Amino acid sequence: MAVFNKLFKRRHSVSEEIKKDDLQEEVEATETEETVEEVIEETPEKSELELANERADEFENKYLRAHAEMQNIQRRSSEERQQLQRYRSQDLAKAILPSLDNLERALAVEGLTDDVKKGLEMTRDSLIQALKEEGVEEVEVDSFDHNFHMAVQTLPADDEHPADSIAEVFQKGYKLHERLLRPAMVVVYN
């Protein structure tokens, strides 16, 4: 019986060890599964958070670009409106300039009565004043500038008349603000 007890105890202790090992393996397996599940759960959340942040950054960049583009469109539109407003009378001024030239030619005719001459001068002056109010100015003819003058004839320069000085103006030139409407036709010493 002593042998039986010994065997029983041994078998019992082996079986308890197996149970303990199984229990420990189960606990370890459960802990490992929980850890893996936690890691798996944390990883998608982190990825989702990162993705959400990236998308938010992307949307913010798109918004900022769209906002900047809208500001540029508004600025360009405003500049275009200002340019149109500034030069709105360009076509009208170009159409009126030949009439102004005709008034100048009529005033140059000899034999006009004082009343007719005064009437032509008043008409010319009121026309010039109306053009000035719109920003139309006569081109200066101090010295030749190819940007504002058209040389229709040249004369040889001498001591009295240096090169690039204007001898005579055939037709006055006009500009609207800084934009040339018509160059002055001049005779130039060369």
Swiss-Prot record:
Biased composition (Acidic residues): 23-42
Coiled-coil region(s): none
GO cellular component terms, semicolon-separated: cytoplasm
Keyword set includes Cytoplasm: yes
GO molecular function: adenyl-nucleotide exchange factor activity; protein homodimerization activity; protein-folding chaperone binding; unfolded protein binding
Gene3D superfamilies: 3.90.20.20, Head domain of nucleotide exchange factor GrpE
Location in the cell: Cytoplasm
Pfam family, any one: GrpE
Keyword Nucleotide-binding tagged: no
Region (Disordered): 21-49
Chief place where the protein resides: cytoplasm
Signal peptide from the UniProt entry: none
GO biological process terms, semicolon-separated: protein folding
Alphabetized UniProt keyword annotations: Chaperone, Cytoplasm, Stress response
Subunit: Homodimer.
Family the UniProt entry places it in: Belongs to the GrpE family.
Biological role: Participates actively in the response to hyperosmotic and heat shock by preventing the aggregation of stress-denatured proteins, in association with DnaK and GrpE. It is the nucleotide exchange factor for DnaK and may function as a thermosensor. Unfolded proteins bind initially to DnaJ; upon interaction with the DnaJ-bound protein, DnaK hydrolyzes its bound ATP, resulting in the formation of a stable complex. GrpE releases ADP from DnaK; ATP binding to DnaK triggers the release of the substrate protein, thus completing the reaction cycle.
Name the record gives this protein: Protein GrpE
Gene: grpE
